[in-house]
From Swiss-Prot:
Keyword entries, A-Z: Cytoplasm, DNA-binding, Transcription, Transcription regulation
Principal place of residence: cytoplasm
Cell location: Cytoplasm
SUPFAM superfamilies (UniProt xref): YebC-like
Range of residues in the leader sequence: none
Family annotation (Gene3D superfamilies): 1.10.10.200, 3.30.70.980
Organism: Wolbachia pipientis wMel
Membrane-spanning parts: none
InterPro entries listed in its UniProt record: Integrase-like_N (IPR017856), TACO1_YebC-like_2nd/3rd_dom (IPR048300), TACO1_YebC_N (IPR049083), Transcrip_reg_TACO1-like (IPR002876), Transcrip_reg_TACO1-like_dom3 (IPR026564), YebC-like (IPR029072)
Protein name stated in the entry: Probable transcriptional regulatory protein WD_0484
One of the protein's GO biological processes: regulation of DNA-templated transcription
Similarity field: Belongs to the TACO1 family.
GO CC term, one of those recorded: cytoplasm
Length: 246
């Protein structure tokens, strides 16, 4: 019976992992579709599409699925029309979150996001309720390995970006720039250093709250995880970071 139970647990875990993988693929395909619809189908001429394809390849999304998503988005194939929406809300202890979604039904998504916030000790707010706590910037991220920070920094100075910093904890180099300069800055870094790990518009907190309380960390982690488990939610940004208790 122990062996049977263990096998059942393995099957259960594999099923959960497969479901997560399938959901991730769905979100990647959705981003590729929207990116292709908004611009040219050639990734070299459409940076958002290029970034979406790069992200999809990192997650091993099959090539045929990528090509089909682009073809469906740019052809005459009837398909879903997705709307980009940003929801703002407060988490436990007054923390602030911005939830980015791609949805084909805004009423359904708003209801689901509101329910998750309320169930996890937060509340969904109105537009502008927390975004004033953030700066809206262009964000470009490279892995530290393989890219020299001094070279990135020098290039950033030439391009007059807002900031170039090292995130040793995550092993990343992070560049931020003005929204109006994002396109040219992203393309200039791509031309010199190749495709970044991440390149998008982002809400960066003006004051980052460091949280070390384990109970609060668990609550916030549960909230963010459940939000990101929603099929329509692409990603979540917040004004907090978790640190080890002293």
């Amino acid at each position: 019976m122990a062996g049977h139970s263990q096998f059942s647990n393995i099957k259960h875990r594999k099923g959960a992992q497969d479901a997560k993988r399938s959901q991730k693929f769905t979100k990647l395909i959705r981003e590729i579709t929207v990116a292709a619809k908004q611009g040219l189908p050639d990734p070299e001429l459409n940076p958002r599409l290029r970034s979406a394809i790069f992200a999809a390849r990192k997650e091993n999304l099959p090539k045929d699925k990528i090509e089909t998503a682009i073809k469906n988005a740019t052809g005459n194939v009837a398909g879903e029309n997705y709307e980009e929406i940003q929801y703002e809300g407060h988490g436990p202890s007054g923390t602030a979150l911005i939830v980015h979604v791609l949805t084909n039904n805004r009423n359904r998504t708003a209801s689901e996001v509101r329910y998750i916030f309320s169930r996890k000790g937060g509340n969904l707010g109105e537009t502008g309720s927390v975004s004033y706590l953030f700066d809206h910037v262009g964000l470009i991220v490279y892995k530290a390995e393989g890219v020299n920070f001094d070279d990135l920094f020098s290039h950033g100075i030439e391009l007059e970006v807002l900031n170039v910093e090292e995130n040793d904890k995550e092993g990343l180099h992070v560049i931020t720039c003005e929204i109006k300069d994002f396109g040219k800055v992203r393309d200039a870094f791509y031309a010199k250093f190749g495709e970044p790990e991440l390149a998008r518009l982002s809400w960066q907190p003006k004051d980052l709250i460091e949280i070390s309380d384990k109970e609060l960390i668990d609550k916030l982690s549960a909230l963010v995880e459940e939000l990101e488990d929603n099929d329509d939610v692409q990603y979540v940004e917040g004004n907090f970071t978790f640190v080890d208790a002293v």
